[in-house]
A protein has these predicted regions:
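Alpha-helical transmembrane segments in multipass membrane proteins, preferentially the mid-helix core
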Residues: 131-146, 163-170, 196-200
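Core segments of transmembrane alpha-helices
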Residues: 43-50, 99-107, 156-163
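Structural signature of hydrophobic alpha-helical transmembrane segments
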Residues: 61-74, 117-130, 183-187
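Small-residue-rich transmembrane alpha-helices that serve as helix-helix interface/gating elements
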Residues: 180-196
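N-terminal topogenic module of multi-pass integral membrane proteins
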Residues: 6-89, 205-210
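Membrane-proximal helix-loop-helix units in multi-pass membrane proteins
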Residues: 105-155
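Cytoplasmic-side transmembrane-helix entry/capping segments in multi-pass membrane proteins
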Residues: 90-102, 149-156
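Hydrophobic alpha-helical transmembrane segments in multi-pass integral membrane proteins
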Residues: 51, 107-116, 159-177
């Protein structure tokens, strides 16, 4: 049986469209992979710089310490907003959408708490560490099948929640805490982001060489 030319042409065109769609999907997936790696490196770098500033200038100046304490949750809100936007938007990333809201509310709460005492500030950070940690854990679990290095994010989220409970307990002590109490928590976060970024970078390089 002879196949007509229009049918052959349509079949070839359809195959080309499928191949183009597949290629576009692969490129988009690769772009997201590279973005997430850069994102983790950026988060690690910011947290490391924040810790250094907190332990130096923040320990010498109350004004600098206050600014750093406000900036930290504000940055987390902005970072989650940008990351969600690069991965389908807030509607498709519910845990990050909630995290943006939680971090934004925390920023406002820190501003209010600074007018009271550092105990209040530490308590606010404790609640935030619990909620943001669990939300980070949820995001990592959701990304587990499609993105590498999420085991580090799961550990980070879990330890953040534990640290939050510890902060709340510390906040009730008579001794006034300082920004140094929070710097250790931020440093641990920087470590996990760096581990995840390096892990992903190594896997991506191996994949390109294969």
């Amino acid at each position: 049986m002879t196949v007509s030319r229009p049918y052959q042409t349509n079949t070839i065109t359809h195959r080309k469209e499928i191949m183009m769609t597949t290629d576009q999907t692969t490129v988009a997936s690769g772009d997201r992979e590279e973005w997430l790696t850069r994102y983790y490196f950026t988060r690690a770098a910011f947290s490391a710089i924040w810790v250094a500033a907190a332990l130096t200038a923040g320990s010498q100046s109350l004004a600098v310490a206050a600014a750093l304490l406000i900036v930290y949750p504000a940055w987390d809100a902005a970072a989650n907003l940008i990351d969600a936007g690069r991965n389908g938007g807030l509607a498709n990333n519910r845990s990050q959408a909630i995290n943006v809201a939680v971090s934004a509310v925390t920023t406002a709460a820190v501003i209010v708490a600074l007018t009271m005492s550092m105990n209040w500030v530490l308590g606010v950070f404790g609640l935030w560490a619990i909620f943001s940690g669990l939300l980070q854990l949820g995001t990592a679990v959701r990304r587990w099948k499609t993105n590498g290095g999420q085991w580090a994010m799961i550990l980070s989220g879990g330890q953040s929640a534990v640290a939050g409970a510890f902060f709340i307990a510390q906040a009730q002590m008579p001794e006034a805490p300082s920004i140094a109490n929070i710097a250790g928590y931020a440093g641990l976060g920087a470590f996990y982001f760096l581990v995840s970024a390096v892990w992903r970078s190594v896997k991506q390089m191996r994949r390109k060489r294969a």
